[in-house]
Amino acid sequence: MRNYFLLTLILFSSFSITAQKILITDLEVDKLNSPHGLDNKNPKFSWIIDTDHYNVLQTHYQVFVATDKVFSKNSLVWDSGKVASEESVYVNYLGKELAYDTQYFWTVKVWTNKSKRSSQSKVSSWKTGLMDKQNWKSNWITVNNEDMTSPKIPYFINDFRVDSKIISANLYITSRGVYEAHINGKRIGDAILTPGWTSYSNRIQYQAYDVMEMLLTGENRIGVMLADGWYRNFRQNRKNRIVDYGERTSFISELIISYEDGRKESIIDEKNWSYNYGPILSSSIYNGERVDMNLKNSKWSFPGHKNKNSKKAKIASRYKGFIDYTRNEMIKKREVLSAKELIITPSGDKVIDFGQNLVGWVRFKSALPKGTEVKLYHAEVLDKKGEF
């Protein structure tokens, strides 16, 4: 009987060692999951050892970085070699100089104290962005001088052609103000109030978008809506404009296309930028928006569509601060809340209660006659008398 139990114990012990599974997961570059547009010339790699056993420690690692998924010899830009280290967070890239607007693939092998054989991660990737200021070939674009102080929101457009087969297309864009970009009638990305607030005098963040699937063979159009945002503002209690960071809003963009024949170019001709005005009469972080839906033009960013009263755009002053890639989470729509209660105040105002404090905007349908003015105001609480 004792021999039977001993044999059973040995068998189970052997099974637990051979069945031990080690996975290398959660690959990150600069603590980001497959970032698109990263501007760091010396990024840092991180990974996690995933196992259901205790006391599994990394003893060595080996990182590979290449410009193709198969890590061919010609595409390899870094092989760290087998490094004796427990480090698995912020491992420095020490390979060849990284190129701008280029996709890189990477994987890591890990050795542990529990096995002489290595475990290898799946292949991950990241896309470099505009690594230096000189990669921004375009100038900043703005309205002409006579429209500089207008609170209306300009709609900029630029037409261009794509006649060769492309393998990638990336838009890099930022603004002094807030922007919303479109290509061929479709909104680019889902972030709100881009590029987000920073100390504009010192630093502005740019965003990068993969727009390859949005482009057409032949005629194309890029469109940019530009609002004051945090950059400058009009105050309701002041007749003059309050300049927070500058007198004039502007934006800069690079649409970089890589072709199947090996060419890469920034496709937008800045001399082709023009603008007109649409339904947004004013837009302010502090005072909300005024919109005239009679002026809505849903085809303004469609290729070939002629926008009325277009004006030639102007090149704005260069930005003296630092432009870097957005690393923080952007403002996005997270959920849709329905109204919970309609409250009639003692003075007869209609208050719609959503049941919780929130940041967002209102969507509603109306059968009111054309020309009716609707005013929506927002607040957190009613006063002691129940008034808005």
Q: What are the residue ranges of the model-derived segments?
A:
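Extracellular/oxidizing-compartment recognition motifs
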Residues: 22-388
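Bacterial Sec-dependent N-terminal signal peptides
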Residues: 1-23
